[in-house]
Amino acid sequence: SDPQRYAWLGFGPDGNEGGLNWDVIAAVGQAVKAGKLTGPLKVRKTVIGGWSGSGALTLFFANTFHMRERMEDGGPIFDAVLLGEPGWYPRINADSGDLIAYDVRQRPAMLDVPMISVNSSAPIEFGMPFRPRADSDDPKGRFRAYEVAGADHRGAREPTFNNPQEDCGAALSDFPLHRYYSLAIDHLKRWSDEGKA
């Protein structure tokens, strides 16, 4: 990168304009779905998803921009949504305020594509504001919530804390949460392809 060349670009007073997230997610999704970034590979379906912080961005995009940002033919950019324990709700841009805890906007919206949410017991244990809605097969709001009891937010494959102050000496969970996330991906694919949850 060239700091002098790009010095004129501004991203808010603290150098972080989160409002650009939504434009980037939409533009990249549209380009991928249109086959502009995939070379000889053909795109059959696009899925948006993430875990923890990126899960929160996924929830925000799905709730706020999924029905607004579309392909040229009016169809969805993303054919399915996978929410991985979004524990907070990001601001729409650098100037907006935080949502209050348990704001209704932290609940997954009714969309025209299937959505699966995977959660450990952390949202309950730590009072995270995200709460899934009821399971539904309604074509205007297909949704499933997989709540995995006994799992922690990070899962067994995550590295241990590097900060000794955060390590209380107790054994970390060996619960294979990643397997449930993989299972959710498989179920979401089947639901999107075959219409079976």
State where each predicted segment sits.
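C-terminal His-loop and adjacent cap/lid subdomain of alpha/beta-hydrolase
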Residues: 1-197
